[in-house]
Amino acid sequence: MAKNSNKVRKNTNKENNFKRLAENRYAKFQYAISETIEAGIELLGTEVKSIRNGKANLRDGYCSFRDGEILLLNVHISPHKNVGSFFNHDPLRNRKLLLHKKEIIKLKSNTEKKGMTIVPLSMYLKGSWIKLTLGVGKGKKLHDKRQDEKQKSIKKEINSVLKR
């Protein structure tokens, strides 16, 4: 006998489940982001536990190239509190980012332009994997920051008037 093929399957796609673990709002203020890219990150077990508890700080982080690889530098992930100091990780260690070679080459060519840099924008869970959103951007000058603040305040005023 043939099996009943009319059964409806539930969509249990893990890729639709996103949980933001850390965000770098300062980078969006400090840089004019022109491009974003998703990257995996090579972590230790205690780092994963700390990140899931929300103990990651992306504010001072940036990316660098070494030996054909891209490294995440100066991102602080606090040591896990329930593990002894011998088994814990260094909070500011360099972490390798997992990208395809073509993506690394593209990012390297973008950063060779004057003033361009790669900064982490957010860290989130995608299924059971911890992913990082990287932004390629150029540092803003003081007058650019002031102009952005003016535009934000104008948008807020317009939205408040429209809600009335």
Swiss-Prot record:
Keywords of this entry: Cytoplasm, RNA-binding
Mind listing the GO molecular function terms for this protein? RNA binding
- Biological processes, Gene Ontology terms: trans-translation
> NCBIfam families, per this entry?
PRK05422.1, smpB
Does the record bear Cytoplasm in its keywords?
yes
Taxonomically, which superkingdom? Bacteria
Q: What is this protein called?
A: SsrA-binding protein
Q: Which InterPro entries match?
A: SmpB, SsrA-bd_prot, SsrA-bd_prot_CS
Family (UniProt) = Belongs to the SmpB family.
* Cellular component per GO, a single term: cytosol
UniProt keyword Cytoplasm present: yes
Record field: compositional bias (Basic and acidic residues): 145-158
Query: Where does the record place the region Disordered?
Result: 143-164
Give the PROSITE patterns listed for this entry: SSRP (PS01317)
**Which compartment or compartments is the protein found in?**
Cytoplasm
Q: Which CDD domains match?
A: SmpB
Give the protein's function. Required for rescue of stalled ribosomes mediated by trans-translation. Binds to transfer-messenger RNA (tmRNA), required for stable association of tmRNA with ribosomes. tmRNA and SmpB together mimic tRNA shape, replacing the anticodon stem-loop with SmpB. tmRNA is encoded by the ssrA gene; the 2 termini fold to resemble tRNA(Ala) and it encodes a 'tag peptide', a short internal open reading frame. During trans-translation Ala-aminoacylated tmRNA acts like a tRNA, entering the A-site of stalled ribosomes, displacing the stalled mRNA.
